[in-house]
Amino acid sequence: MNTVRVTFLLVFVLAVSLGQADKDENRMEMQEKTEQGKSYLDFAENLLLQKLEELEAKLLEEDSEESRNSRQKRCIGEGVPCDENDPRCCSGLVCLKPTLHGIWYKSYYCCKK
């Protein structure tokens, strides 16, 4: 019975001492991995930031192109009624009261200059 107790005590002491060593080793490994993880996270963050900046630049470029062309897209074409106070006729057209068919409609139309 004493041998069983001594053996059990010896195994218990070895398990505790080796377990503590493993715990310290695990703690050191975890610190190393978190330091490596931080560098990976910084790298990934920088990469993501670059991609987002490129995407933002493309979107702003598309918006500026759209705004340059938007005047011509939103202008009023020839023969379309317009407001004499706020003419939005396309380039080369003027908002005038026509001589013939304007009499019936009492309106201004975009006509060539």
Swiss-Prot record:
Tissue expression as described in the entry: Expressed by the venom gland.
Transmembrane annotation, as ranges: none
Keyword field contains Repeat: no
InterPro entries (UniProt xref): Toxin_22
Keywords assigned: Disulfide bond, Ion channel impairing toxin, Knottin, Secreted, Signal, Toxin
Location, primary (coarse class): secreted
Segments of this protein annotated with the region Disordered: 61-83
Cleaved signal peptide residues: 1-21
GO cellular component, one term: extracellular region
Molecular-function annotations in GO: sodium channel inhibitor activity; toxin activity
Compartmental location: Secreted
Disulfide cross-links: 75-90, 82-95, 89-110
Propiece span(s): 22-74
Domain statement: The presence of a 'disulfide through disulfide knot' structurally defines this protein as a knottin.
Family: Belongs to the neurotoxin 14 (magi-1) family. 01 (HNTX-16) subfamily.
Function: Probable ion channel inhibitor.
Name this protein carries in UniProt: U11-theraphotoxin-Hhn1s
Organism whose genome encodes this protein: Cyriopagopus hainanus
